[in-house]
Every structure is written in C-alpha cells, then in structure tokens.
Amino acid sequence: MNTAPESDLAAGPVQLPHSPLPAYYRDEVEHQRFLRRIFDETASDYDRIERVLAMGTGPRYRRMALQRAGLAPGDKVVDVGIGTGLLAREACAQIGAAGSLVGIDPSPGMLKQVALRGIQLRVGRAEQLPCADGEADFLSLGYAFRHVSDVGRAFAEFYRVLRPGGKLLVLEISRPESRIGNALLKAYMRILVPVIARIVARERATSELWRYYWDTIEACIAPAQIIAALEAAGFEAVRRHTELGIFSEYSAVKPESSGLLK
C-alpha cells in the first residue's frame, strides 16, 4: 500500500489547527498521548452524549452535509477520524452496496465502537494515511480537524488519497461571529455540556473531553485560514457552507488533471 514517505511529510513549517493548550499537554508528544487516552477512555460514552446534545438531529444534518458535498451512490469513501462511525453510517447509506468505505482513526477504542458491516477499519492519522494514492472518490473528516497535528500535512494527504476529480468534505464547529453568540455557545459547551456528561456518562474522563472540545473550538484557526490551506494544498472549488452560524462544511475538489501533490 502506498503512503506518503515520512521524510516528505516532515518537510515544511508546521501549521497547527489551534494554538497550544497547556492545560492539557505541554508539547506534541504529550498532545498525541492525551488524544489517544481521552478518546480511548470515552469511546463507549461518545454516541450516548452526542444523541443528548444534538437532540436527535445529528443523523439528518450529517446526511444533508454529505449530499451537499456531492457524495454519490457507488463512491469509494475514506472517512478520516471515523470515531464511532456517526458520519460513516450516513455515508454508507448513500453509497449503497456498490460503494465502499474505509474508516481511519488513531484511537483503537473508538474503532471498537464502530458497528457497521462491510467496511474496512484502519488505525492511522490524518498526517500519514494508510491509503493508496488515488484510492478515494470521496474523503470526509467529521469534527476532527481540531485534533490534527499539522493542517498542511493533513490536507496534502487528503489530496494524495483522492483520485483526480475526487471530492472532500470537512465538517467542523466554528465560533459564532457575534460576541453574544460566542458567549452563549461557550457557556453551553464549557459549562452545561460537561455537567450533562457527568450525569449521562459512564466514564469519568467524558466531562474532560467536552471541556477540551470547547477549548479547541475557541482556539481554532479562522475559517479563512482553513480555506487558504485547502487551496494551498491544490484543491479547487473550495467553499464553506454554514448552518446556524456554527456548523461549518468545507467542501473542495481535487482537479481532474493533477499530480499527487500540487
């Protein structure tokens, strides 16, 4: 299986998805160790908390986002940061039996929670995907952008793994533009959600995960920087669609006539 050489991936300056968060880790080694621990420990709680917080609307929104990005029946999909399979479940329903899906995640604990038949699961990171060049018609990253270590490396890998003409969808939560909206979302995510997590969750680390979740949202780079990074990686037709002012959908296309990298 072709993957990008480690030496190539190490070239160039590192672009972080958000400023460092010393309350959780001191350096990149600790960052990766923290992410592995927090997602492994909270995997069994994740779907339960998501259903409560989204009030049952999550599946419909994910389905519509995939449709807007151009996912088609029969597509070969690579879902990066598959987690427990929430986005992959909707993708499988849309691609049908003629399609295929590969789910990738660095957390074995999360992968154990994926209850989907007929898909492949691989342990891996966005910065070095265990995928062949041009393997995918469609590549998705659902609410995991804030957890990558290097935006440029990750987007270069997405470009490599997509076939020419392949489509990309990145789902993320963005800070509201208004001060009031931002304050309300912060209070919800930083205070109320951890309280709900302590009540509903079975694992002690779950409330910590949701506090970290908000802190990464608050520290995340601006949407314009994400769009610029996608364009720098070689993608075309880069667009951002938003729902309710906070749910961002970044869609893009790999040019039909292109090399592996720009």
What label would you give each PLM region?
Residues 30, 175-229:
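C-terminal alpha-helical "lid/dimerization" subdomain adjacent to the S-adenosyl-L-methionine
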Residues 166-173:
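Conserved beta-strand signature within the Rossmann-like core of class I S-adenosyl-L-methionine
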Residues 233-262:
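Core SAM-dependent methyltransferase catalytic element
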